[in-house]
Amino acid sequence: FNPLKAIIVITEPFWRVGEVEVIRVLLQLGITYLHVRKPQAKEPEMRTFLSSFSADEREKMVLHDFFDLAQEYGCGGIHHNSRNQTIPLGWNGRLSRSCHNFLELKSYKAAYDYLFLSSIFDSISKEGYSCAFTADELDKAHQEGIIDKSVYALGGITQDRLAEVFAWGFGGAVFLGDIWSRWDSPYFVSYIQSVIKTAQLATIPSILSIAGSDPSSGAGVQADLKTISSIGGYGLTAISALTIQNTQRVERFIPISKNDLLDQIRVVSEDFSVKGVKIGMLPTLDSVEAVVEALQTYSFPN
């Protein structure tokens, strides 16, 4: 199974002009799977739709209806829901299911490749579908192993909520309203790229280096970034001082103010789930106080 965080897009329930082209772009940009949910569709319409894609593209598709067509057209998965809960004879593709509480997750987890849990946030596409869980409930479910890499978050998912979703232990995120509200925007492609990049970075441990900046790259944050990269991490930095040095000597340093150091740590913490911190040069008492305050504020792992 894909070790990266999964990004899944569900189609809108109705047919849209230009939908095939949009889906092809989504698949080319690297979404994990496309879930095809068209509850009112007729079989000829679904056949026409599936015939519009290559075999490789259909392998990334998961059907919510017409499971026999999934077999016939080589789709990669089928998704159980209140309408359809059968498994075609001889089916060996992916199998997924929608869940709406923790009891369902525990009951179905062993039988499926992955499960959707909804609604994590207030729905964007469905009025009246409010979030069903508190943050504390999701944290507890993660700690108890109920939410794990085989459970994907659905409901109100947007790019700026992914860090929170992945911090709760979800193995993927399921988009619907957020994606389709942007499909005709000139920034659609860049937004999808940002979503996928966020998912990729969530899989790579983010390590924060708090240290001086060495223009020769032999020490300081520059050296730390190389080391972090070499062990498979993603390096983040908060510079405590600008140093005037080379590989032979340090001539002098210019301390960064307490507030500026704190602001650096704050902005990276807003964007990334920091998994470790490496502390180097802290040239003044102010910089020591800034780091102590940041460690207390953001609860970085030991």
Describe the role of every protein-language-model region:
Residues 4-20, 96-98, 153, 209-218, ...:
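Active-site mouth loops of central-metabolism enzymes
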Residues 10-13, 32-45, 54-107, 113-119, ...:
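Catalytic beta/alpha-barrel core
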Residues 22, 61-76, 80, 100-111, ...:
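Catalytic cores of alpha/beta
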Residues 25-31, 231-244:
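N-terminal glycine-rich anion-binding loops that anchor highly charged ligand groups
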Residues 43-51, 242-259:
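N-terminal beta-loop-helix "entrance" segment that forms/cooperates
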Residues 47-65, 90-102, 130-153, 192-199, ...:
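Alpha-helix-loop-beta-strand connector modules within alpha/beta enzyme cores
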Residues 78-89, 116-129, 159-198, 236-244:
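Glycine-rich phosphate-binding active-site loops on the catalytic face of alpha/beta enzymes
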Residues 250-302:
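Glycine-rich phosphate/dinucleotide-binding loop and adjoining beta-alpha-beta core of small-molecule
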